[in-house]
Amino acid sequence: AAVENYVEKYPDKIHLIDGKSTGGAKYNFFYLFGQVEAPYYMTCDQDDVWLDKKIELTCDKMLTIENKADVPCLVYTELRVVDSELNTIADTMSEYQSLDCHKRTINQFILQNSVTGCTMMVNMALRDKMLHITDIDNTIMHDWWAALVAAQFGKTAFIDEPTILYRQHGDNSLGALGINKLSYIVRRVWQKKQIQESMRLGRLQAREFAKTYNLPTDSLAVRYAALEGKSRRVRQRFYKENDMYKTGTMRRLGQAVWG
């Protein structure tokens, strides 16, 4: 009812897309991207709080990197992690998750995503390129796919300033994790199956990416996907040769032991 009220109040600004559920966050966002024609797109989760300058800062940065309309461009920002009452848990998501958002090469994005979808802006060229995807099932999340496309074919930029209050709670699909907390460390380091499954899904996504965009056999995505079934020694040599390491001590350790 709240949404309908806003539509009635601002009919020229708000359009309700009354579609049925598509099966989860990534499916919903891919569906929505396909329903709207606009020069720029920003995605939002229902319980996030946007700070006053979020749109202005993001749009200004977009305009500085978008020198051609046909170049896929992505801008994303820092977040402040808060609880359900908006009390600060961590000043920045980068600190909380041990992320390095300044490492934005295709090598890094194939291995690890640092883009949080509710902070990103994509231009039409990126939206169009993203929608070439052939099988959404083989992606991990829509924001990761956007990062891959922008890094491979266009430009990315990061704003090192929080533009959003990101609520951390049990309902987040892929929410923030306090990766440096002792409880996380003890629980995670020895979770061999979970770490290996995470790496497997990343290789599956890389294969889908290479197939969707018909990348050459010597491309990084193709070669990374081909690690599936290879020995640990082969995988570790590949990471070293291509400078592909996850950020954060614990992720790096998990990659070294089980990746």
Over which residues does each language-model region extend?
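C-terminal subregions of glycosyltransferases and related glycan-biosynthesis enzymes
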Residues: 131, 135-139, 156, 165-259
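Nucleotide-sugar donor-binding/catalytic module of glycosyltransferases
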Residues: 1-178
